[in-house]
Structures are given as C-alpha cells and as structure tokens.
Amino acid sequence: VARARRAISRRSFLGGVGAAALAAPVLTGCGPSRNPNEITFWNFYGPGGQQKSQSDWFVQLAEEWNATHDVKVRLRYVPTKDYTSGPTLQTSFSAGAGPDVFLLSPGDFLRYHNGGALLDLTPHLTPEVRADFLPQVMQTRLVGDRVYGLPLEIEPLALYYSEAAFEQAKLAEGDLPRTWDQLLAVAERLTTPDRFGMLLETNPGYYQNFTFYQSMWMAGGEVFTPDQRRAAFNGPGVHAALQFWQDTVTAGVAPRRVKGAGANDSLSNISDGYCAMQQLGIWGIAEIAEQAPDFRYGVIPMPSPAGGAYTTALGSWAMVANAKSTNPQAAAEFVVWALGSTDPACIERMRRWNTVAKTNLPPRYSVQRAAEQHGAFDSGPMRVFKEQVMAQARPEPRYPPEVYRAISDAVQSCQLDDGDPVSAAEAAAQQIDTFLSTYDGAPIN
C-alpha cells in the first residue's frame, strides 16, 4: 500500500523543486519495477523530454509523491514517436513486463482493456471526483460504470497558419479558409519551392487516424452504424474525406512526409517554415511559446467541406494503472492522487499542466474554473480554441486494433498511393464487418 507519511500543502506544491524534492530525488529507470516498494511510470514527457516545462511537471509530480509516500515512483521517458507509433509499450506487455502506470489514448484503450491490462480505478474514486470530470472525456475510459483511466487533458484540433507566410503571399485575414476548396486554393498560393502550403499527418498510426476522423465527421462520415453492429465506413462522407486527403498531396500543396515526430510536432514543421498551415492540436501553443517564441502565427477552426458540418476532434491522454502490476494498490493510488483528488494541490497541479506546462483544456470542471480565474482563456490562441474551435466537438473514439488498422490502411492508400477512395473504403468496411462478427470485448465507442 502506498501510505502517505504527511500531507502535501498547496504552498509546498507551488514551491516547486524545494527541500522535499532534494530529500527525495526523482527515480528514473529503463524497465518496469519488480520491487514491491517501487512502481514504474512510463510516459513521453520526462525526464529529459523535448519540452522542458512538461518534463519538469512530470519530474515534480514524481518528486512530490516520493517525498510523502513509502512506495516510490520511477519515471521512464520514451520518445513520443516510439511511444505513440512504435512497439515499445506493446512489446513490454507482450513480454509480461509492462509498466505499473502509463499513459493511454482512447485509440489504444481497447487493446489494453480487452487484454486484461487495465486496473479498475473505481474503488479509489469518490462520487464527487467522478462528477467533476467532463463526461465527453470520461466516456472512453468507462466500461459499464467502472473507470479504467483518468484523463490528463482535452486536446482539440485546429488549423495553425504562419502570419509571415500569409503576408509574403499578400493574403489577409479575409482570405483565411473556411471550406476545403478554399483551403486548397489558399494552400496553393502559400506553396513555394521551399515550403508546402499546408500539412496533414502522413505517418500511419493512431494519431493520423485521430486527425482523419475530424475530416470524416465534418463530411458526414462514420465508421459504424448507430448500433455499432456494422461498418458504415463505405459511405459518401468517408469517400469525400479520403478524396480530400488525397487531393492535398496530388495538388502538391501538402507533403508526402512530415518532419520531426509527425504532424503533432509544430517545431519541426510550421514554425520551422516547412509548411504555412498545419492541422495541429492545442498543445502547439506551449511548444511554440517555449521553443519558437518569435514565430508569429494564428489559429482558426479547421475548414469544413461545402455542405458539411464543422466539428473538432478531441484528443485526450489518460493515466492508467497496470492490472498485472506487482503493486496494483500503489499504482491505483498514485493515479488517483495525481489526477483524481479534491485536494487543492491536485487542482493546482492539473491547472498548471493544462494551461502552463502543456496548453490544453482541463478535463475537470474544478480545474476549468481555476484556469479561468487565472485568465488562461482571456486572449490569444487559447481564447480562439475555447470560444471558436470548441464550438462543436467530438471525442476521439476507441476502436480495437483491427478496426484502427482497416481505417489506417484506407487513409494511407488514398493519401500516399493514389488509391481509389470508394474501393479503399469498401475494403476497410469489409474488414471491419468481418472483425465485428466475432468481436468479444468491451463496447466500441
């Protein structure tokens, strides 16, 4: 059991890396713990991650826990691309050596839940805390009424644009695109021999699927019928979205390969001049502020197809505990202490993550109120996200790996291999229906 030795005051938390941190330095390591007095926490932020403010937040999180609990947390940093698109996490679980605590997106939830890897956190949560989480980000962490993860954040997608690129192309605010046709036309004007006009994700993976869902939904497409029993992927909305993604590449206004970690990386792409517009999440605000503060940019809602209906897609990483941990009690207690407490220190911790260390939207009402009191959404891109981008939103769905792969294959075929959207959607729908006929797992949503 992770037994607290003394309470943490709000002042001591805000004090940062102080005496308590020096007395109990953060532990780091490469493998999962088999020590009953230690739990491992794998993440793609720190220590030593690309964004210092985010790395520091994770280091301080572990230090605060370690200073007040007998069971210690050992952090392991896994580079973002390896964590989200590589085999590191899956391989560790296949070998029976998965971390005690880790970060999980909705897109990968069913892989781990259906495999029996996720610990039920419900016994550790009060009804008050459960009601404090926004339902749209909790629903993909629930199976029945049981909670299997606590969200860190809400991360909507939008379109970032370079103000300098617009000025060079003699484009003004009135030229900002609102439709797909306008987006392609503006991207063409912004394209130069050294810069693409726009950028969408090209790397296959859960992140690309997540960004594609926004286009699909805006065009009226769906993956499943409303009862979740059959594929609806072979429909006109999906065809239109696949065609649009293909058009961006065949028109020469978007690259076949993104730079850096992927299209979730603002620093290697738009702020570095590789593209003039980029579909990107709210986290880009903090990235640019910390590492490219002189880059001038704006944010608008992602353009939608003519006759379509605007929406954004909501990403949201959650902290989860390994059901097969050697100390599941401590793993669960750590997750709930970090993100699921009514303690003022927990609220302040989450506020700092959501609006200082990594700009995003808080997943808890209490944290939203605290962020508003600090003026987090009063101006600039954060205000645009809160007031305009979030006008209509849908959370990232959770699909089993077989469904994800069918969708990914269709997107990759059309975007990069000049595949026929109708044929690609039909093939994916057939694969999904075949899989559904024998699926036996948690509800898909």
Predicted regions, residues:
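Conserved N-terminal structural module of periplasmic/extracytoplasmic solute-binding proteins
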Residues: 2-111, 306, 330, 419, ...
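Hinge/lid segment of periplasmic solute-binding proteins
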Residues: 107-158, 184, 208-211, 215, ...
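Extracytoplasmic/periplasmic solute-binding protein
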Residues: 143-152, 157, 167, 181-231, ...
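Glycine-centered hinge/linker elements that transmit conformational signals in sensory
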Residues: 186-189, 227-259
